[in-house]
């Protein structure tokens, strides 16, 4: 990227997309100003900057000459943006997302870090009952789900490569149908994905999985394996899962262990070439997808939706994931030691500045380091430097 230092950061990001921002697509036949790709780029800007509404996007475009120059668009109304978000073909955004994910996967393979784990889970986003009646789950809840597959090549190197949006009443099992496909990776799932018929099919297709089972799941021991002394593993066995009413045809492996809080976990797996300790550690990595969902909702525009129409919501979900992959690409290409959140924070401030100034800030070393004041090293002093306000002495002593 350094061979085009004169470019702004936003132009660098645009160059990563598989379609030119000024290209008119088939869907733009009758469009005069806001073409599909211009709208997509504007919504990616909204994700990066966390613009909260169509009105804020409208003002931001009028206020930023470099964004106007980039999009060749001086202004656009919030109502036009609202209509456009619902008109963008979701299949186009899904293809762009998969293109970026494929590039990320190729970089990982070149480094010898192909996807070792594929973590499957879903996260819900609530909708107002009055506006989200099409996604009602009960008289008190309405919303949508993001069913996600997260590729983990290392604890600090992970990225999404597949996503299925759905209404809130779609179960996790249904969402996993298209997310679990033949692969060399190990699929990691929590309770809620324990479908015996599907697990049988995975075993038959040589798909490796590690699933936490519900406590009520029945397992008949076929063969017990020795458990290492002094470890947190309490059982390692070959079992037959289910009862006479409903059961699996193929046998699987049962690994039981407890964590630091003495909580017990029952894991069913089709992986036989790893130790019980390794199986337990693989399942513990499932927490990474929880952290990833939290990162998306905190740092991108995902927790609060711009629209309450199905296609517009699906589009916003894919736009958030596309933005996350762009941030990951910048972090990888610059070879910075900073986290994705640190890179995103700098991107926000330097989005319309030169790439060179962004790199200077990204590579900047702390001016000085200090261990800080040690706890309890000095007396506690209540500092009040104003006559405004009332403080009543507390009766309670520390």
Give each language-model segment a name:
Residues 31, 63-82:
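Short, basic interhelical loop/turn and adjoining N-cap
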Residues 135-139:
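Extracellular beta-strand-rich solenoid/capping regions of secreted or surface-exposed proteins
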Residues 107-111:
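Short boundary motifs at domain starts and secondary-structure transition points
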């Amino acid at each position: 990227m350094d061979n085009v230092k004169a470019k702004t950061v936003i132009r660098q990001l645009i160059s990563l997309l598989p379609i030119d921002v000024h290209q008119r697509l088939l869907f733009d036949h009758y469009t005069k100003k806001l073409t599909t790709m211009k709208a997509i780029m504007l919504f990616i800007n909204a994700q990066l900057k966390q613009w909260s509404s169509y009105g804020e996007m409208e003002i931001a475009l009028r206020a930023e000459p470099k964004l106007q120059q980039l999009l060749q668009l001086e202004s656009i109304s919030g109502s036009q943006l609202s209509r456009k978000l619902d008109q963008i073909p979701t299949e186009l955004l899904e293809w762009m997302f998969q293109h970026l994910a494929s590039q990320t996967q190729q970089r990982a393979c070149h480094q010898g870090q192909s996807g070792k784990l594929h973590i499957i889970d879903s996260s819900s986003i609530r909708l107002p009952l009055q506006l989200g009646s099409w996604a009602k789950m009960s008289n008190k809840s309405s919303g949508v789900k993001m069913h996600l597959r997260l590729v983990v090549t290392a604890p600090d190197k992970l990225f999404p490569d597949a996503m299925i949006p759905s209404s809130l009443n779609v179960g996790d099992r249904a969402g996993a149908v298209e997310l679990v496909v033949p692969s060399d990776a190990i699929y990691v799932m929590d309770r809620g994905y324990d479908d015996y018929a599907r697990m049988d099919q995975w075993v038959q297709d040589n798909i490796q999985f590690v699933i936490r089972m519900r406590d009520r799941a029945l397992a008949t021991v076929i063969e017990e394996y020795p458990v290492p002394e002094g470890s947190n593993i309490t059982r390692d066995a070959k079992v037959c899962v289910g009862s006479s009413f409903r059961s699996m045809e193929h046998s699987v492996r049962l690994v039981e262990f407890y964590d630091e809080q003495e909580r017990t976990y029952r894991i069913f797996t089709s992986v036989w070439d790893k130790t019980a300790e390794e199986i337990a550690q693989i399942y513990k990595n499932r927490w990474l997808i929880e952290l990833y969902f939290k990162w998306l909702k905190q740092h991108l525009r995902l927790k609060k939706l711009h629209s309450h129409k199905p296609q517009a919501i699906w589009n916003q979900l894919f736009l958030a994931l596309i933005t996350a992959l762009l941030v990951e690409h910048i972090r990888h290409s610059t070879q910075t030691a900073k986290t994705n959140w640190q890179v995103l924070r700098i991107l926000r401030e330097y989005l319309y500045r030169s790439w060179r100034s962004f790199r200077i800030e990204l590579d900047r070393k702390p001016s000085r380091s200090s261990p800080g004041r040690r706890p309890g090293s000095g007396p506690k002093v209540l500092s009040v430097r104003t006559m405004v306000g009332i403080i009543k002495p507390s009766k309670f002593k520390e």
